[in-house]
């Protein structure tokens, strides 16, 4: 055993010795590398001396102190050699070295554990440590600028990593702290240099993590050189060369071309652990020679841009335009998005994807690629040429227009308007193109056209500006002017960009776009005439801002036939809808026709200016398309009747322009798009008064997931939506209306709900302004994800009737027009809305929609005149005021609506408004909401189609949740009330309990801030058996709590 143990000890000792030898070898190797590097660096500076000095053996030559003093003299510019005394005596050498060290200390270079004796003896570790501190302080720290001269310098020994082993003085706590501080400062300076190197090499795909192993391949050196002069290095070739070749090439190029001294050799780097300090010393020379590169943070755009991308500066277009067209292919499918961001003026830039797929993406027809794919490059170049040349009428068909894929081909010219002057973002999907042919044409026909790009782009950008202005209705005048300019330009250019490409769009829907886009110049006069004080006349489908023609093809955004299209539609599509809604509001303010709003929609699809979430629209897409037809039909009923007739008229005028082949596709699409297309057609029929509504309704095509965000607010303002036919039409949604596509409720459904309930809701909005309205919109967003299906079904099932009179007033911009024509629209709505609704909506929706719209119109009519348009708008804008007004008017409204025999109470109105607005959540304080809905159950069955019945369960759940929240709130209020009751009230408690109803109402008044529900709401609340029992229980509980203390007192 002893022998074995002995052998084990010997073996361990041998292993330890071998390890020590390896460490020593590494240490010696590092010292040798540092010695060579530092010697070269010192000689580099000593050459400046007069006479020049040279170091052959650093450890020997530095012992007399002359080399050290000469080096410091060159680096600092101060005279030190005059103090040098040459002598062979050690004492004189120590004196020379001490003077040099004293100078360093005076220069705030704090040296740790380095004394003159060690330097005079030639201690390798301390000599290298001294030189490294000099390099770090006089070169690296000054270059990086991290540490000022006033801060102490770091003193890290180079190779050994410590100096105490060779120091004659043992380290003290103070010395250790100094070392720690020095190391920290050194790391900071090196880190700064590393950051500079990383910025220089990042764009070449070289990852530099440190100053050691990252440089072994030589690519980092080459990348730094290439950052300074790209012509000196070929990185592709470097990837194929060996490490030695790369290192040799880097050092040679740096020396020969950049005049950077060759401090390193390939052998110094081609080791397992390259010396960090040597590499830092060498790399710092690049920063020293080329300091102008230090602040450079930008990356070469040519290197960063994708290979397939091209940037084109449109100098001719105004900066305001900021047209940016981006064509992208998604998921291998030919899905393309054209973005023109004009909400804020970005630099005029056109981003065109050179991939062949992108052109095919433009062809949204049933044929996925068609001929556009073949001419993708040509298409890109043509678009760019058009943009640069500014040829207004020249949009050579890049791809031959196919019968179905002729979405880009203009109806007149028979050529595709592939030009990209898009006002807003457009998303095209190859699969969607069948149904989303509308989106194709609107964007490409008039919006994407770069014909006379300066003009077209300017106009388009102006329209985009319109859309952004639509978001801000306050800038109505400015947006009107821009819209007019855009409309005029669009009318000039739109004719070429026909909606024929809108294969999926129904002829009615397409005609509106076609007439506005294809025949924009021809129809623009009529449209303008129609638009005039009212919206565009039914005869023309073009959208006009006042006297100008704004042609917007929103149909492009919605593929109607396939429900899956919405799923495929990128987030930008939803954005597009959202933008369209905003633009609709703006266009309405400008008195633009729905077509113009649609156009903006198409443009806005990709724009991210609006609050609508792309994801929401996406989620909406599949169901939205399926239910879109049904729900849209119903909502269209509710949509302001005047709007629909105009849309119908426009739609009818447009169908001749649109190819019949596209009609079938368009029909389903139209159902989803019909809201806006209907609105446009109906709006044309009732152009005088329903142009605004028309714009509003079509602007939010359900399937297109056109944002109806503004739908709600407009409805509150009293927008009149006639039941729009299922066929797609061009329309502009007032920017007050907010439609959240994540609710799968079709746009048409919401719009028609507004149309039928227009009058009722109008009076309700003006008189009662339920807190529910504003609250519903907020809750809609909050519960969007949870209640997408419910909300969609509720919107489709629950058609809300907005006051017809309010349709124009609701649009803030239309208010001026409405003033003259508000009565006309109202009168027209009565007769015109049902016909238009019947024409375009499915039979069921036609029947139900007109009836409900008429009924809803009748009760609200008395109050509509009472409420001025401005007041309605104001109420819509201020949800809080609406809540209070509605609370106070709840009682009055219930009487009003009950009088006609419709059994509509303020609750019913509230329910309608909530449904109309996709009620995701009712206000906590409004007790009448729940009761109202139950009382109107029969009305829902009578007036709403089977779709509404299908969603009854969802509505009940919502009501129950609202009731529960209300009950909890009431309980809180009661508790607070009882806590506030005084002692004398305790004695009178029994009496108060007997008069529970009176107490309840009074109790509402007692707590400040808890009086949110109106008295009649409380009465209705009390009338419910469950609520009454619950309140009785609470009263009994409080009574017992109050009685027990008295019993205790009597016992005492």
Curated annotation (Swiss-Prot):
A cellular-component GO term for this protein: cytoplasm
PTM sites of type Phosphoserine: 537, 679, 724, 856, 925
SMART domains xrefs: CH
Compositional bias (Basic and acidic residues): 455-465, 472-495, 594-614, 622-651, 659-669, 711-720, 759-773, 836-849
Keywords from the UniProt entry: Actin-binding, Cytoplasm, Membrane, Phosphoprotein, Repeat, Transmembrane, Transmembrane helix
GO BP terms in the entry: negative regulation of cell population proliferation; neuron projection development
Record region (Disordered): 148-178, 391-420, 455-545, 585-727, 758-929
Compositionally biased region (Polar residues): 509-529
Modified residues (Phosphothreonine): 710
Membrane spanning residue stretches: 1027-1047
Listed Acidic residues bias regions: 780-791
Pfam family, one: CH
Expression tissues: Expressed in testis. Expressed during testis maturation process and in maturing spermatids. In brain, it is expressed in neurons of the hippocampus, cerebral cortex, and thalamus, Purkinje cells, and also in the choroid plexus and ependymal cells. Expressed predominantly in dendrites and cell bodies of the neurons, but not in axons. The level of expression increases during the period of maturation of the mouse brain after birth.
Location of the region described as Actin-binding in the Swiss-Prot/TrEMBL record: 1-288
Molecular function terms from GO: actin binding
InterPro entries given in the database record: Actinin_actin-bd_CS, CH_dom, CH_dom_sf, CLMN_CH_first, CLMN_CH_second, LINC-complex_assoc
Basic residues: bias regions: 880-889
PANTHER family per UniProt: CALMIN (PTHR47535:SF7), MUSCLE-SPECIFIC PROTEIN 300 KDA, ISOFORM G (PTHR47535)
Protein name: Calmin
Gene: Clmn
């Amino acid at each position: 055993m002893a022998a074995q143990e002995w052998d084990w000890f010997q073996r361990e000792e041998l292993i330890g010795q071998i390890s020590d030898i390896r460490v020593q070898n590494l240490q010696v190797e590092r010292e040798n590398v540092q010695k060579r590097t530092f010697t070269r660096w010192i000689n580099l500076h000593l050459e400046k001396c007069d006479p020049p000095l040279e170091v052959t053996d650093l450890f020997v030559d530095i012992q007399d102190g002359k080399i050290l003093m000469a080096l410091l003299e060159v680096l600092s510019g101060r005279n030190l050699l005059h103090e040098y005394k040459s002598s062979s005596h050690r004492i004189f050498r120590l004196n020379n070295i001490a003077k040099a060290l004293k100078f360093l200390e005076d220069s705030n270079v704090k040296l740790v554990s380095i004394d003159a004796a060690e330097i005079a003896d030639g201690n390798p570790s301390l000599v290298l440590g001294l030189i490294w501190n000099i390099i770090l302080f006089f070169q690296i720290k000054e270059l990086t600028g991290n540490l000022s001269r006033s801060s102490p310098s770091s003193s890290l020994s180079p190779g050994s990593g410590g100096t105490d082993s060779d120091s004659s003085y043992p380290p003290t706590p103070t010395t250790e702290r100094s070392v720690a501080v020095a190391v920290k400062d050194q790391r900071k300076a090196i880190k700064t240099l590393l950051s500079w190197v990383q910025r220089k090499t990042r764009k070449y795909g070289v990852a530099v993590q440190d100053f050691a192993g990252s440089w072994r391949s030589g690519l980092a050196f080459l990348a730094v050189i290439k950052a300074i002069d790209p012509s000196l290095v070929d990185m592709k070739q470097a990837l194929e060369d060996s490490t030695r070749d790369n290192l040799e090439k880097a050092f040679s190029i740096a020396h020969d071309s950049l005049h950077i001294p060759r401090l390193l050799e390939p052998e110094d780097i081609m080791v397992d652990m390259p010396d960090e300090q040597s590499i830092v010393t060498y790399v710092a020379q690049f920063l020293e020679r080329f300091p102008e590169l230090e602040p450079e943070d930008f990356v070469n755009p040519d290197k960063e841009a994708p290979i397939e991308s091209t940037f084109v500066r449109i100098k001719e277009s105004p900066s305001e335009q900021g047209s940016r067209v981006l064509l992208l292919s998604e998921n291998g499918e030919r899905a393309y998005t054209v973005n023109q961001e004009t909400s804020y003026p970005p630099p005029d830039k056109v981003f065109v994807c050179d991939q062949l797929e992108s052109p095919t993406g433009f062809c949204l027809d049933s044929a996925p690629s068609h001929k556009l794919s073949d001419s993708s490059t040509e298409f890109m170049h043509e678009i760019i040429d058009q943009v640069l040349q500014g040829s207004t009428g020249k949009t050579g068909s890049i791809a031959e227009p196919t019968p179905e894929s002729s979405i880009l081909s203009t109806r007149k010219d028979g050529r595709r308007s592939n030009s990209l002057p898009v006002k807003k973002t457009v998303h095209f999907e190859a699969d969607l193109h069948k149904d989303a042919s509308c989106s194709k044409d609107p964007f490409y026909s008039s919006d994407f056209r770069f014909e006379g790009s300066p003009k077209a782009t300017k106009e388009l950008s102006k329209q985009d500006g319109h859309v952004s202005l639509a978001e801000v209705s306050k800038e109505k005048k400015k947006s009107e002017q821009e819209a007019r300019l855009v409309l005029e330009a669009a009318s000039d250019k739109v004719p070429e960009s026909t909606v024929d490409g809108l294969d999926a769009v129904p002829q009615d829907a397409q005609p509106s776009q076609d007439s506005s886009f294809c025949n924009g110049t021809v129809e623009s006069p009529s449209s303008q005439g129609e638009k005039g004080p009212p919206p565009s006349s039914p005869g023309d489908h073009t959208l006009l801002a006042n006297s100008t023609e704004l042609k917007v093809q929103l149909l492009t955004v919605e593929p109607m036939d396939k429900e899956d299209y919405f799923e495929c539609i990128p987030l930008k599509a939803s954005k597009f809808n959202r933008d369209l809604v905003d633009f609709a509001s703006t266009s309405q303010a400008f008195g633009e026709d729905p077509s113009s709003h649609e156009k903006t929609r198409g443009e806005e699809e990709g724009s991210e200016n609006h609050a609508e979430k792309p994801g929401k629209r996406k989620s909406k897409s599949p169901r939205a398309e399926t239910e879109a037809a049904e729900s849209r039909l119903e909502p269209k009923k509710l949509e302001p009747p005047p709007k629909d007739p105009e849309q119908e008229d426009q739609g009818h005028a447009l169908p001749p322009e649109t190819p019949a082949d596209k009609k079938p596709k368009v029909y389903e699409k139209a159902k989803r798009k019909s809201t806006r297309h209907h609105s446009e057609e109906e709006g044309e029929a009732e152009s005088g008064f329903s142009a605004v509504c028309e714009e509003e309704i079509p602007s939010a095509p359900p399937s297109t997931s056109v944002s109806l965000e503004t739908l709600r607010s407009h409805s509150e303002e009293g927008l009149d939506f006639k039941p729009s036919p299922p066929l797609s039409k061009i329309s502009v949604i007032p920017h007050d209306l907010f439609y959240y596509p994540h609710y799968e409720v079709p746009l048409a459904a919401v719009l028609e709900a507004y149309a039928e309930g227009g009058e009722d809701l109008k009076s309700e909005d003006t008189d009662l302004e339920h807190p529910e309205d504003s609250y519903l919109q907020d809750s809609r967003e909050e519960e969007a994800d949870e209640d997408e299906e419910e909300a969609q079904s509720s919107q489709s099932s629950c058609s809300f009737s907005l006051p017809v009179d309010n349709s124009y007033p609701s649009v803030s911009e239309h208010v001026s027009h409405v003033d003259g024509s508000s009565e006309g629209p109202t009168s027209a709505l009565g007769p015109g809305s049902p016909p238009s609704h019947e024409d375009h909506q499915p039979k069921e929706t036609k029947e139900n929609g007109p009836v409900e719209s008429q009924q809803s119109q009748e009760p609200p009519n008395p109050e509509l005149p009472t409420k001025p348009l401005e007041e309605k708008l104001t109420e819509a804008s201020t949800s809080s005021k609406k809540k209070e007004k509605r609370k106070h008017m709840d009682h009055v409204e219930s009487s009003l609506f009950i009088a006609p025999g419709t059994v509509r109470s303020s609750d019913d109105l509230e329910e309608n408004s909530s449904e109309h607005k996709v009620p995701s959540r009712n206000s906590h304080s409004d007790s009448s909401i729940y009761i109202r809905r139950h009382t109107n159950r029969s009305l829902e069955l009578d007036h709403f189609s089977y779709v509404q019945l299908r969603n009854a369960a969802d509505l009940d759940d919502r009501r129950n949740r609202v009731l529960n929240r209300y009950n909890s709130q009431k309980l809180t209020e009661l508790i607070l009330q009882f806590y506030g009751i005084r002692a004398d009230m305790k004695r009178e408690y029994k009496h108060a309990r007997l008069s529970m109803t009176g107490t309840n109402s009074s109790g509402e008044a007692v707590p400040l801030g808890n009086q949110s529900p109106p008295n009649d709401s409380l009465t209705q609340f009390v009338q419910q058996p469950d609520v009454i029992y619950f309140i009785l229980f609470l009263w009994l509980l409080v009574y017992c709590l109050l009685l027990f203390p008295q019993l205790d007192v009597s016992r005492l």
